[in-house]
C-alpha cells in the first residue's frame, strides 16, 4: 500500500530487504504471502516470520501473489491481472491455480500437494469477489482444506534448571 509492503494486519513489514524488494508502487494492490525459503518446508512459517520480522538481514524471500484487489470482477479476472503485473518482477511468484470439476479431481489435486509437503489446499470460487480477511464457509469465496488439527497452548508455569542435561548435538 503506497509503496510499503504490509502484513495481513496492515502493519509495515520490518525487514529492510523485504521493503526494498516488495515495497514498490508497482506492486500496490497485490495480495499474497511472503515466503522465506522452500514454500513446502516444514518450518516455512518459522523461517518466514524470523526473516521478515528482523529489521536487518537479507532473507531468501519471495512474494507468492494470489490476487489483485485493485481489479474489479471475479477472482479469475483479478488473478489474470495480478499474473500480468508480476511476471517481470524479481522474486515474485504466482500461486498455481487449477480448475477442479468434481470430487475425484479435488481429491487428486489435494493428494498431489500433500505429497509435495504442503499442509493442504485452498479452494476458490472463480467468480468470487475480493474479500480482505477470511471468507466464511457460507460465502464459499475462499475455503481452506486442511485435514489435520493444530492448536495453541498457554504456558502456565516452568521450572528453571541450573544445568543443561540435553544430549549434545552438532549443527551440521
Language-model segments: residues:
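Amphipathic alpha-helical
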Residues: 97-160
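Conserved protein kinase catalytic core
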Residues: 73, 130, 163
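Intrinsically disordered or highly flexible coil/loop and linker segments, enriched in small
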Residues: 75, 91, 115, 119-122, ...
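Covalent nucleotidyltransferase
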Residues: 1-93
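Classical nucleotidyltransferase
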Residues: 1-33, 135-172
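Short, surface-exposed loop and linker segments with low hydrophobicity and enrichment for Pro/Ser/Thr
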Residues: 54-59, 112-117, 166-170
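Hydrophobic/aromatic-lined pockets within catalytic cores
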Residues: 70, 87, 114, 159-163
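Intrinsic-disorder/low-complexity, polar/charged segments
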Residues: 15, 74, 101-106, 167
Amino acid at each position: 500500500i503506497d509503496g510499503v509492503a504490509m502484513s495481513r494486519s496492515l502493519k509495515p513489514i520490518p525487514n529492510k530487504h523485504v521493503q526494498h524488494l516488495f515495497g514498490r508502487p508497482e506492486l500496490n494492490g497485490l495480495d499474497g504471502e511472503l515466503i522465506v525459503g522452500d514454500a513446502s518446508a516444514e518450518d516455512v512459517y518459522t523461517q518466514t516470520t524470523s526473516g521478515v520480522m528482523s529489521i536487518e538481514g537479507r532473507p531468501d524471500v519471495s512474494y507468492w501473489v494470489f490476487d489483485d484487489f485493485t481489479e474489479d470482477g471475479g477472482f479469475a479476472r483479478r488473478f489474470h491481472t495480478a499474473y500480468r503485473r508480476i511476471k517481470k518482477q524479481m522474486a515474485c511468484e504466482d500461486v498455481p491455480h487449477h480448475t477442479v470439476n468434481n470430487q475425484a479431481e479435488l481429491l487428486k489435486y489435494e493428494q498431489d500437494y500433500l505429497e509435495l509437503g504442503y499442509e493442504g489446499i485452498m479452494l476458490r470460487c472463480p467468480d468470487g469477489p475480493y474479500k480482505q480477511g477470511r471468507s466464511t464457509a457460507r460465502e464459499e469465496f475462499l475455503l481452506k482444506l486442511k485435514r489435520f488439527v493444530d492448536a495453541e497452548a498457554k504456558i502456565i508455569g516452568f521450572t528453571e534448571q541450573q544445568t543443561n542435561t540435553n544430549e549434545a548435538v552438532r549443527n551440521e
